[in-house]
């Protein structure tokens, strides 16, 4: 029963990938790379010079604390990195960029490829602190597919009414 939506979700992911990824290749962009910080007490959202709701900051800080103190990757870090990168993709003025914007990430660096603007309306550049060096992800298709699957998961199921 749960597989009924898999076809439309796959089609949505495929469509969005070509609309947002392939359409933005080849533009004249500037690459900004945010490398790791040596101070492990600086959390991911606090290290970013961007203001977001405090509950996101708490989740990010808890995930980073877990990784730093145990050495194990915490799955929440990956998901929150995706969420943050998608915010940059959706609102490029956060990092003084104009569209098109591409975001790439690994454990030690988040790369924003965009046309840089000197506007004062943006909130500045970003810095992150990651641990797992093997994490290499292309953000947008992963995040869009994840949210599409999440949306489908919480959609109300059709109910059969007996006669």
From Swiss-Prot:
Alphabetic keyword roster: Clathrin-mediated endocytosis of virus by host, Disulfide bond, Glycoprotein, Host endoplasmic reticulum, Host Golgi apparatus, Host membrane, Host-virus interaction, Membrane, Secreted, Signal, Viral attachment to host cell, Viral envelope protein, Viral penetration into host cytoplasm, Virion, Virus endocytosis by host, Virus entry into host cell
Biological process per Gene Ontology, one example term: clathrin-dependent endocytosis of virus by host cell
Variant or mutagenesis effect after changing residue 28 to Q: Not glycosylated, no cleavage of the signal peptide. Not glycosylated; allows cleavage of the signal peptide
Subcellular location: Virion membrane; Host endoplasmic reticulum membrane; Host Golgi apparatus membrane; Secreted
PTM description: N-glycosylation for overlapping sequons occurs at both Asn-28 and Asn-29, and blocks cleavage of the signal peptide between Gly-26 and Ser-27.
Short name of any one Pfam family annotated for the protein: GP3
Signal peptide boundaries: 1-26
Annotated region (Important for peripheral membrane localization), positions in chain: 142-158
Effect of residue 28 to H: Not glycosylated, no cleavage of the signal peptide. Not glycosylated, allows cleavage of the signal peptide
Glycan-modified residues: 28-29, 49, 96, 106, 118
Assembly mode: Heterotrimer of GP2b, GP3, and GP4; disulfide-linked. The GP2b-GP3-GP4 complex associates with the E protein.
Main function: Minor envelope protein. Part of the glycoproteins heterotrimer GP2b-GP3-GP4 which is probably responsible for the attachment to target host cell. This attachment induces virion internalization predominantly through clathrin-dependent endocytosis.
UniProt family annotation: Belongs to the arteriviridae GP3 protein family.
Protein name: Glycoprotein 3
Organism annotation: Equine arteritis virus (strain Bucyrus)
Taxonomic lineage: Viruses, Riboviria, Orthornavirae, Pisuviricota, Pisoniviricetes
């Amino acid at each position: 029963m749960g597989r009924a939506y898999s076809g439309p979700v796959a089609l949505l992911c495929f469509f969005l990938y070509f609309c947002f990824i392939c359409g933005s290749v080849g533009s004249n962009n500037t690459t900004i790379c945010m490398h790791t910080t040596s101070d492990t007490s600086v959390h991911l959202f606090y290290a970013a010079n961007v203001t977001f709701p405090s509950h996101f900051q708490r989740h990010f800080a808890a995930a980073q604390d877990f990784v730093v103190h145990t050495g194990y990757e915490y799955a929440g870090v990956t998901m929150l990195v995706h969420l943050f990168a998608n915010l940059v993709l959706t609102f490029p003025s956060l990092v003084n960029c104009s569209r098109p914007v591409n975001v790439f990430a690994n454990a030690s660096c988040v790369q924003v490829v965009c046309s840089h603007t000197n506007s004062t309306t943006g909130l500045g550049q970003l810095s992150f602190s990651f641990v797992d060096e093997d994490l290499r992800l292309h953000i947008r298709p992963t995040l869009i597919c994840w949210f599409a699957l999440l949306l489908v998961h919480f959609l109300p199921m059709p109910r059969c009414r007996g006669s």
